[in-house]
A protein has these predicted regions:
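Cysteine-centered motifs
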Residues: 19-21, 27
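N-terminal secretory signal peptides that target proteins for export/translocation
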Residues: 1-17
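Solvent-exposed adhesion/ligand-recognition segments of exported proteins
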Residues: 4-5, 26-232
């Protein structure tokens, strides 16, 4: 497999590309997979936990915010595991630093086999400039009202694992290796097959803070009437 490094932002009507990644990361270059029809994507079920001490507080009353707390720490890395991870329109998925500990990277995986439909807001609270990674091998769709409110860079991937600089892996499937999660930074996105799931951005500008980056790493990337940008 070939390693690719680069930084590219895309805009326009309908753009289809095999892989996008920010300069701070590396990704495995892959054979593209055709994008499934996402025009009628549903946002059910929303967010559930699948281990690693991930806690999710469901909205109550008039609230539309899911607070994601706890998780499993290794140094300044914070790991979360979700059975499903989708954000309905007008809802907020809020990664909340309930411990107050210094955090460099928030790494989340989705294990349930359903795509992540991000139609609301992804947010981090109390993490400063921590980077956010979300890995779902089943696919990721950003709807027309999707938004990011994250202090650091963000990476969305349909990879099967994240490889860290010390050689450790954070796998999309739970297993005994979870006992050896690492404090090292993310070095690469790893795929076990030649047909990774696609990522779609539908009619929305996904923006991050000035000086930060957006990485979309997986199969075909389709940007329909939207842009990827920072706020410079």
């Amino acid at each position: 497999m070939k390693m690719m490094r680069g930084s590219r932002l895309f805009a326009g009507g309908a753009t289809r590309l095999p892989c996008v990644c920010a300069t701070m990361f590396a990704c495995w270059w892959l054979i593209p997979l055709g994008l499934p029809d996402t025009s009628h994507a549903q946002v059910t079920p929303p967010i559930t936990s699948s281990g690693l001490n991930t806690h999710i507080s469901k909205p109550s009353g008039n609230s539309l915010q899911y607070d994601i707390t706890a998780g499993t720490r290794a140094g300044t890395n914070l790991f979360h595991s979700f059975g499903d991870f989708s954000v309905p329109t007008n809802n907020i998925a809020n990664f909340l630093n309930d411990s107050g500990l210094a955090t460099s990277n928030i790494l989340g995986r989705v294990t349930g086999g359903n795509p992540s439909n991000i139609f609301g807001t992804l947010q981090t609270t109390g993490f400063g400039g921590a980077n956010l990674f979300l890995m779902n091998p089943a696919g990721i769709v950003f709807g027309p009202n999707a938004a990011l409110n994250v202090g650091g860079s963000v990476s969305f991937t349909t990879a099967d694992y994240l490889r860290l600089t010390d050689g450790a892996r954070f796998n999309a499937i739970a297993g005994p290796q979870d006992a050896a999660i690492s404090s090292a930074p993310v070095a690469a996105f790893g795929f076990l097959g030649s047909n990774p799931a696609a990522i779609a951005v539908q009619g929305r500008q996904l923006a991050v803070a000035e000086g930060q980056g957006i990485s979309l790493v997986g199969g075909n990337l389709t940007v329909q009437g939207g842009t990827l940008a920072d706020t410079t």
